């Protein structure tokens, strides 16, 4: 038998446990839907060398990054989620490119670009003429060359899940099928941009029910690529990194030109743009 005091303590603890459990579920839900903006990876590219302190290159670079903090400047790029701008002439030309995830356009895009830009310039790759950084919601690249419209085969990385698939619970063919279907949607889905011009969205997300489990995925290509370029980029990176992820429960493969992700849990809001349930 419980004493009256112990019973009262038990009843007091029940709502506390419920509240704590609810809060933990909410935190987990926010994290799983990728609403955070975590740093993922960066690369300092040595090919183009370094710029000198006080040079025209450094001044142009600083001016560009600082302008991103102004809500009235480059608002078009933040609203569309993509911008590529070149300033100056070689050898002091500076090319800045950023791409935001389509469901992170607007203020989220600007916040990510500002954070990533300063992180790359000041902490990760100071004085490098070419560097790239990836966050959850965006990538930022600066370079002394204009490479728009070209597939970048050099700057990439693979982030596999720490957990392996058990048996044949979700086959390689099923994962490839989802990624291929999402790529088809990304290159064939036409929508109007903020100027009313019809263009391929080059992005798709979705989920597929497989028995008792669901497989979630997302693909995105850089907005400067053509439909053919997007297809080629996705095919290359799916094959190139297959050994990295073929036995894993999830993976992120990111490059300068395209990226994809799949997981056994939801990481994209199903109410977001261009989401499909297969």
Swiss-Prot record:
Residues 39-147, 160-267 form the Gnk2-homologous domain. Pfam families: Stress-antifung. Its main location: secreted. Residues 1-32 form the signal peptide. One of its GO terms (cellular component) is extracellular region. Keywords: Repeat, Secreted, Signal. Disulfide bonds: none annotated. It is found in: Secreted. Belongs to the cysteine-rich repeat secretory protein family. This is Cysteine-rich repeat secretory protein 18. The lineage of its organism: Eukaryota, Viridiplantae, Streptophyta, Embryophyta, Tracheophyta.
């Amino acid at each position: 038998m419980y004493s009256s005091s112990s019973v009262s303590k038990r009843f007091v603890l029940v709502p506390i446990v419920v509240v704590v459990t609810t809060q933990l579920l909410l935190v987990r839900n926010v994290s799983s839907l990728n609403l955070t903006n975590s740093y993922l990876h960066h690369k300092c590219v040595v090919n183009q060398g370094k710029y000198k302190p006080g040079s025209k290159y450094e001044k142009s670079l600083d001016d560009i990054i600082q302008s991103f903090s102004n809500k009235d400047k480059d608002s078009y790029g933040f609203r569309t989620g993509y911008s590529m701008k070149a300033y100056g002439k070689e050898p002091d030309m500076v090319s800045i490119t950023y791409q935001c995830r389509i469901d992170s356009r607007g203020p989220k895009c600007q916040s990510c670009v500002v954070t990533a830009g300063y992180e790359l310039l000041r902490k990760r790759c100071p004085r490098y003429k070419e560097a790239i950084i990836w966050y959850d919601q965006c990538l930022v690249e600066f370079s002394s060359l204009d490479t728009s419209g070209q597939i970048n085969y050099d700057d990439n990385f693979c982030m596999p899940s720490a957990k392996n698939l058990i048996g044949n619970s979700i086959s390689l063919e099923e994962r490839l099928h989802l990624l291929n279907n999402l790529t088809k949607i990304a290159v064939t889905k036409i929508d109007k941009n903020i100027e009313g011009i019809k263009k391929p969205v080059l992005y798709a997300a979705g989920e597929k029910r497989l028995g008792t489990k669901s497989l979630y995925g997302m693909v995105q290509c850089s907005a400067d690529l053509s439909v053919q370029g997007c297809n080629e980029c996705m095919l290359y990176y799916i094959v190139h990194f297959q050994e990295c992820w073929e036995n894993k429960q999830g993976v992120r493969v990111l490059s300068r030109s395209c990226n994809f992700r799949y997981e056994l849990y939801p990481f994209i809001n199903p109410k977001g743009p261009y989401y499909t349930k297969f």
